[in-house]
């Protein structure tokens, strides 16, 4: 049986208005599009890098 992947919950706390288009695309890649939305994603180095790129717009709610 496969081991369950670690998951991370990310909440959008900032608006992408007047931000660089790459930051908007990163939010879309994180499955976020409105303030207050929460997305549950696999905890991978790629996702951590995306969170780091928009750390002023998101916060980590929960790590499992």
Curated annotation (Swiss-Prot):
Keywords attached to this entry: Methylation, Ribonucleoprotein, Ribosomal protein
UniProt PTM: The protein is methylated on either Ala-2 or Lys-3.
GO CC annotations on file: cytosolic large ribosomal subunit
A GO molecular-function descriptor: structural constituent of ribosome
Organism superkingdom: Bacteria
SUPFAM superfamilies: Ribosomal protein L30p/L7e (SSF55129)
Keyword Ribonucleoprotein appears in the UniProt entry: yes
Listed InterPro entries: Ribo_uL30_ferredoxin-like_sf, Ribosomal_uL30_bac-type, Ribosomal_uL30_ferredoxin-like
CDD domains from the UniProt entry: Ribosomal_L30
PANTHER family: LARGE RIBOSOMAL SUBUNIT PROTEIN UL30M, MITOCHONDRIAL RIBOSOMAL PROTEIN L30
Record note on quaternary structure: Part of the 50S ribosomal subunit.
Family, as annotated: Belongs to the universal ribosomal protein uL30 family.
Protein's name in the database: Large ribosomal subunit protein uL30
């Amino acid at each position: 049986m496969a081991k369950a992947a670690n998951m991370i919950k990310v909440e959008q706390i900032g608006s992408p208005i007047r931000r660089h288009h790459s930051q908007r695309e990163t939010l879309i890649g994180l499955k976020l599009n409105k303030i207050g939305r929460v997305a549950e994603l696999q905890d991978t180095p790629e996702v951590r890098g995306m969170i780091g790129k928009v750390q002023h717009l998101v916060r980590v709610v929960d790590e499992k």
